[in-house]
């Protein structure tokens, strides 16, 4: 199922509500954001693994500012869908995760977060691959 850019889709799975969203302006922002993250990955050996060392969202890079604004909007959309009608305060914390061929991402959770999300700047072609992960034992 596909939705227009900027229109969130909500799915009630288990007691957890999932939200998917194609960010408006992603076609222009993603290449710029990818270049920025790849440069950061080259300059910082532990960028992907040392996620507590920095916060991507404090950057003043235009593509990161765009992503931060989109994430703030997504938090408001999610909270509204959950029926939260009062003012909510939050802090965005994020990091770039650059995976090369053969890399993997362990199953995990974020126990100190009331909301977690992932934004994929680029993904490889999945047309000829089988399921890349089984969630029979989710984190």
PLM ranges: what are they?
Residues 2-84:
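Non-heme Fe(II)/2-oxoglutarate
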Residues 13, 86-88, 109-113:
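A generic structural micro-feature
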Residues 84-94:
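A short coil-to-beta-strand element that immediately follows conserved catalytic motifs
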Residues 93-139:
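Catalytic core of non-heme Fe(II) oxygenases with the double-stranded beta-helix
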């Amino acid at each position: 199922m596909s939705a227009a850019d900027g229109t969130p889709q909500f799915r009630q799975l288990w007691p957890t509500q999932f939200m998917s969203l194609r960010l408006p302006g992603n076609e222009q922002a993603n290449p710029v954001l990818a270049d920025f993250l790849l440069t950061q990955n080259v300059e910082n050996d532990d960028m992907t693994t040392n996620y507590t060392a920095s916060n991507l969202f404090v950057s003043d890079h235009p593509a990161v500012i765009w992503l931060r604004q989109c994430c703030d909007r997504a938090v408001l959309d999610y909270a509204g869908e959950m029926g939260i009608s009062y003012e909510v305060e939050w802090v965005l914390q994020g990091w770039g995760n650059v995976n090369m061929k053969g890399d993997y991402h362990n199953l995990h959770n974020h126990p100190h977060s009331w909301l977690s999300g992932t934004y994929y700047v680029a993904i490889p072609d999945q047309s000829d691959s089988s399921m890349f992960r089984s969630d029979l034992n989710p984190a």
